[in-house]
Amino acid sequence: MKKTVKNLTALLTLALAAPWALADAASELQTRLRKVSVFSADFTQNVSSANGKQVQQGSGKIQIKRPNLFRMDNKKPQESQIIADGKTLWFYDPFVEQVTANWVSDAVNNTPFVLLTSNEQSHWNQYNVQQNADTFVLKPKAKNSNIKQFDIRIDGNGVLKGFSTIEKDGQSNLYMLRNINNNDIADNLFRFSVPKGAEFDDQRKKKK
């Protein structure tokens, strides 16, 4: 009987502690991210299938300016741009000449990259966060998210080392960073204008 009571007490303690642990991890991650206000780096991307087989390699450049400004230029194997200007998340595919625009608040569920620059608690509230040393594991609360998991590797000084995603179908994307610097970045690099002749899918009008 005493053993049963002890087991129940231990389980209750873990149950009560879990929410606090998640909250502490989210707070620690946000604290680390806030330590660096400007960041840019080249990246290499490895895409693997659910069974671990590498299916594609890519490269590009990522630029961050806090708060809320984000830009990712994919250069290989195919050019594309993801730009967050603080309100709108733009995705541009020059190969098919198509632009998609979403409100950041609507897109963060499927595009967790914007959390790297976001101070908006409503964005962070969409994810559960766990910490394992310098790796933070983010899992979306919404069941309809296309993302299963987003990992951020960042040290105690706020230096972003890399990140990765696991999609709902099991495909993983690993981003490794190099040529990291903290030189100032002009705000106009985070502005986007729809190129002439491009097809424009404005999801903002459909959701607001």
Curated annotation (Swiss-Prot):
Purpose of the protein: Participates in the translocation of lipoproteins from the inner membrane to the outer membrane. Only forms a complex with a lipoprotein if the residue after the N-terminal Cys is not an aspartate (The Asp acts as a targeting signal to indicate that the lipoprotein should stay in the inner membrane).
InterPro entries (UniProt xref): LolA/LolB/LppX, OM_lipoprot_carrier_LolA-like, OM_lipoprot_carrier_LolA_Pbac
Name the record gives this protein: Outer-membrane lipoprotein carrier protein
Signal peptide, first to last residue: 1-23
Record keywords: Chaperone, Periplasm, Protein transport, Signal, Transport
GO CC field: outer membrane-bounded periplasmic space
Subunit structure and binding partners: Monomer.
Gene3D superfamilies in UniProt: Lipoprotein localisation LolA/LolB/LppX
Intracellular or extracellular location(s): Periplasm
Sequence similarity: Belongs to the LolA family.
GO process annotations (BP): lipoprotein localization to outer membrane; lipoprotein transport
Keyword Protein transport: yes
